[in-house]
């Protein structure tokens, strides 16, 4: 399809200039139709040559960073305890229940913030507080209904608090596109699929395939989260690049201290960058980063942020339709 070939051009360095001297920097992308779950385009790797081995769109498990916040924190807060975009959450010095200080990306605290401000500026402390306010089993129900597989002990549904900032065994772009789809379409989940129909060779019988539609959140929850994430799309320059209403969430992750020390990386080195964005018609999730660690090759947080946003802008131009259609207010 046209979308697939334009996406390939970005991934194969024809229409996007990848950062210099970063040969092992990778990416994976998945785009689906938001009203059906049908897969529209897949980017399995940068410069994929020869046999398809590992697909970074479907076969990885990477920590999802702040793209977790609408799923584990604010979505459940709005859905189950009737929060509004104006609910106040205090951004202050704060610790996990089990100890361990939660810090923000800028190592500062901003005091009283609305839910809108907390999510737009991706503050970690308000995210953890939001996660703690909602019944843990309800959060589990919410994210699993969206296709996310959280990190739990055998036979338990208890979610540890680091899920609030996406620090768990992780996900992949196709699963993340599926999860955000419910925010784009008024609260429905369709499992992503790629086969439209099956024809039996003997009898020529045709079976059309479609994904089951499941209502997973109220239309008002979907709209409130979307309304906030539209601001992030403007903040990252994606809205103006695409020229149509779009909502998105960004995420980055950190290396743990041992890895930093063993590889000799600076503390601001970042292994993963994420963006999950959507219009009323299409959802596209992208991971970019390092699948393997090579001594001497890394991205600083600032480099990752700028590459991540620029790569997503290029992919967004390739994949999103310029319909001008906005999200429906319930």
Predicted region positions:
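Short, small/polar residue-rich loop motifs at catalytic or cofactor-binding pockets
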Residues: 23-26
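Short coil/loop linkers at secondary-structure junctions
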Residues: 83-84, 149-151, 326
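Active-site SXXK
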Residues: 37, 63-89, 118, 178-183, ...
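Gly/Ser-rich catalytic serine loop of serine hydrolases
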Residues: 59-69, 167-170
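A penicillin-recognizing enzyme superfamily signal
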Residues: 1-18, 29-31, 41-42, 49-60, ...
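Mid-domain, small-residue-enriched loop/turn segments at the edges of structured enzyme/sensor domains
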Residues: 100-104, 135-178
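Structural recognition of the beta-strand scaffold that forms the well-ordered cores
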Residues: 28-32, 39-43, 88, 117, ...
